[in-house]
Amino acid sequence: YYEYPLCMTAHCMAVNMTKVKEVGADQYIDTDKHTWSTDGFLKTVDALYNGGYENVAAIYCAGQGGDQGTRAIINNMYGGTFTDAAHTKYTADSAENIKAIQTLHDTKGINFDASIAGGDEITLFRNGTLQMAFCWNIAQQANSDNNDAGLTNDGDEIFPMAFPTDSGDPKLCGGIWGFGIFDNGDEAKIEAARTFIDFIAADPDQVKDSVLASTYFPVRTSVGDIYAGNEVMSEYSKFMGYLGDYYQITPGWTTARTEWWNMLQRVGSGEAVETAVKTFVDN
């Protein structure tokens, strides 16, 4: 099957900037580019931990929900990748990824938590239990269910960040949303679906409103800058320039997602990182 794309976004992470400033760690953050170095990230975690915040961040691994966040933090820290460039194999067992997983495991304030997935992490970040979230995007930044958009439940500032890197060139995971048609053998219904999709996703007078309704960004440059004048969306658009490889097309993707959180659980339970990632790749 094929997808007719409509909109996309870049997944990122977020920090409680109020708490980061409180412990003097905002010096490690480039607030204009929303970037930081791996060393700066680790120093920020350390400052928060020593400042009295025992639970700074979580490597959540109860399931696949939000797994793009744990992949991105691990791949970005030391220049690792999730697959090879040709999308023929998975590379979790690279030296760069092993170093990142081991570093996260050994860092005080970061916990491998098999009881939560991405959605749970967001809740814990919003309620102040965690001071960082690895499962984040513009939909979360704009969420106003429990307070104004961009604030935690207690009113602290939420600041979106690219994942930390040694190189200064973050590679973010992207999400692409669109439409598909199932071939049920009824040509009339298939044609009607085509007409509907063409209207929603390609009609010059409609597509802008369709993308706006998604709260994401257009996949086609022809749609133009639909968020001109919107300070939050314009600022967040900086993350689109950090989009990395769309490796979800690699064969065995469904199995890889399951094996990923299983691997993180094993590391959290004390298994050697080298052993855990070898099992991931072998499976």
Predicted regions and their residues:
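Extracytoplasmic/periplasmic substrate-recognition and gating elements
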Residues: Q102, T107-G109, D148-T215, N262
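Bilobed periplasmic-binding protein-like "clamshell/Venus-flytrap" ligand-binding domains
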Residues: Y2-E3, N50-Q64, A202-A213
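Short, solvent-exposed loop/beta-turn-alpha elements that line the ligand-binding surface or hinge
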Residues: D30-H34, A57-I59, G80-K99, N147-T152, ...
